[in-house]
Regions:
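Soluble "head" domains of membrane/secretory-pathway proteins
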Residues: 2-44, 62, 66, 71-72, ...
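Alpha-helical transmembrane segments
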Residues: 46-53, 195
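Hydrophobic membrane-insertion alpha-helices, especially the h-region
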Residues: 50-66
């Protein structure tokens, strides 16, 4: 009789007689578990999406309030530098950390009486609410009808003159060559002579014959000059339409020979 080797597995009568079965999970319980996991993933995704959107809106509001704001160009007063429907970005660091300079393109709030009452466009309550919200946080260009864009010609104390049609502007006695003027535009059509008051600026459009600028408000308080406190910032780039994208550089050579006011 041969004895079984020690290393040969022996069958277990008890195990063979009573095999152990895997626990059976009901189908409805498994499905419920899957649905629970899916709901948890959906809630997590929704929460992360809301956090991202809120963070983006807060960041946009901070940027608009302290750094950059978008504006829409509605008129031809700055041709050919800016044309209708251009979207520009304006740096709110000037004035502020950075000074304004003669030749800068500036956006400023209407000092009073420069603009007609805005015409409301029919958008419906939802469209109006969406537009106002996006404008408030800086994701939509401001076209509220209370801002203007012009070129800064004179700073506080500057003596700005023009002898009439066909004559050049002078600032503190220095004549200006203005390459940014619209084709065919003259530096001025009528004579004027002004000294810019303290904390103010003298502004003119590049399309002089189609710009109701400082020249046309000389009979008002400030003599046509705009308070510097009204300045929103300096335009520095056209961002839309894409084929008109360009940086808006200061024409430094135009004002290079202008002396400080005496």
């Amino acid at each position: 009789m041969i004895e079984p080797a020690d290393d040969v597995a022996q069958p277990s009568p008890a195990a063979d007689a009573h095999p152990t079965a895997e626990p059976v999970v009901p189908r409805h319980a498994a499905a419920a578990g899957r649905r629970g996991k899916q709901r948890s993933a959906s809630v997590s995704f929704l929460r992360e999406t809301v956090i991202i959107l809120v963070s983006a809106l807060v960041l946009s509001l901070i940027v608009k309030t302290f750094l950059v704001q978008a504006f829409f160009i509605p008129s031809a007063s700055m041709h050919d530098t800016l044309i209708e429907n251009d979207r520009i970005l304006v740096s709110k660091l000037s004035p502020g950390p950075f000074d304004l300079h003669r030749g800068d393109i500036v956006v400023f709030k209407d000092p009073g009486g420069w603009l007609p009452a805005p015409v409301e466009t029919e958008r419906g309550p939802i469209g109006t609410a969406v537009r106002d919200t996006l404008t408030y946080v800086g994701l939509y260009p401001d076209d509220a009808g209370e801002h203007l864009v012009k070129r800064l010609i004179g700073l506080p104390g500057d003596h700005v003159t023009c002898a009439g049609a066909g004559k050049k502007l002078t600032v503190n006695g220095a004549p200006l060559d203005e390459p940014y003027l619209a084709p065919g535009a003259q530096p001025c059509e009528t004579a004027f002579d002004t000294v810019v008051p303290p904390e103010s600026m003298w502004v003119m459009g590049d399309n002089r014959q189609h710009s109701a600028d400082s020249r046309f408000h000389q009979g008002e308080p400030g003599g046509g000059s705009v308070p510097l406190k009204n300045v929103v910032g300096k335009a520095f780039v056209i961002v839309w339409p894409a084929d008109h994208w360009q940086l808006l550089r200061n024409p430094g050579a135009t004002f290079a020979d202008v002396p400080d006011p005496s």
